């Protein structure tokens, strides 16, 4: 069982994993097996497969696929969700009758816009020209995109929000060199103003403590997510629970969804 810790309110922290993938997108575990693992591990899960036209071979990308996806997860004892991409306008194009079937929606930075009309990737291991010579400018563009993401996407949760290109970390390993106080403050202000909950990601082990403490003090809401793609990851929240407790986040600070 994943770590589940009592809080001052007498409930448990870590009893909900709101970010799990299945074989309906790029996960390795079928839906029925996710349900079984969650029950075995004592955690209520939310199915949040990728719904995006950016990778139609792997993601839920068409109207017919999305309706089948919803029908399948609505029949299971799970929360109904999806992970939408900031770099894909699909989330703003879906009709209300579809969007209202989700218990909550997740938005993620899988690519962010640049002023030359190009796109950057948080997964860049090597920074291309000209950004290898202007890394802090690249970071400023990413933070600006994150602020726009939480204030404009029709979502309730932002996932793995502070994840950044490993090419930046190759230049300087200290996360605070990139997530400066000013950048943290800007993002936290946008998160709180939007009402979007900040995911504590067990998979990526972020956000970092200083940003989480600022967000807690500012009144942000939080969720815990495994971002589980493999059986060993599903409903595993040990690091996320430990981090929440370490920075003073309790059950009263959490976003708790209800079935639509």
What do these predicted ranges mean?
Residues 46-48, 106, 159, 199:
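Conserved beta-strand positions in the central sheet of alpha/beta enzyme cores
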Residues 2-18, 31, 174-260:
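Charged catalytic cores and adjacent phosphate/nucleic-acid-binding surfaces used
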């Amino acid at each position: 069982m994943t770590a589940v810790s009592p809080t001052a309110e007498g409930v448990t922290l870590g009893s909900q994993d709101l970010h799990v993938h299945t074989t309906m997108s790029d996960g390795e575990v079928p839906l029925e097996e996710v349900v079984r693992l969650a029950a075995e591990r004592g955690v209520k899960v939310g199915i949040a497969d990728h719904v995006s036209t950016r990778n139609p071979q792997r993601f839920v990308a068409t109207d017919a696929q999305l309706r089948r996806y919803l029908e399948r997860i609505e029949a299971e004892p799970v929360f109904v969700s999806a992970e939408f991409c900031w770099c894909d306008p699909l989330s703003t194009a879906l009709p209300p009758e579809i969007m209202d079937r989700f218990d909550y929606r997740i938005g993620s930075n899988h690519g962010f816009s640049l002023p030359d009309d190009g796109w950057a990737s948080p997964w860049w291991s090597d920074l291309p020209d000209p950004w290898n010579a202007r890394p802090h400018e690249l970071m400023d563009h990413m933070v600006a995109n994150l602020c726009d993401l939480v204030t404009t996407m029709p979502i309730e949760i932002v996932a793995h929000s502070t994840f950044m290109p490993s090419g930046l970390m190759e230049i300087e390993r200290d996360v605070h060199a990139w997530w400066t106080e000013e950048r943290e403050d800007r993002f936290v202000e946008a998160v709180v103003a939007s009402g979007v909950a900040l995911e504590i990601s067990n998979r990526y082990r972020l956000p970092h403590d200083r940003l989480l403490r600022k967000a807690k003090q500012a009144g942000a809401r939080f969720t815990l997510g495994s971002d589980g793609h493999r059986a060993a990851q599903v409903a595993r929240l040990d690091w996320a629970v430990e981090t929440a407790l370490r920075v003073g986040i309790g059950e009263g600070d959490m976003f708790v969804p209800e079935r639509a």
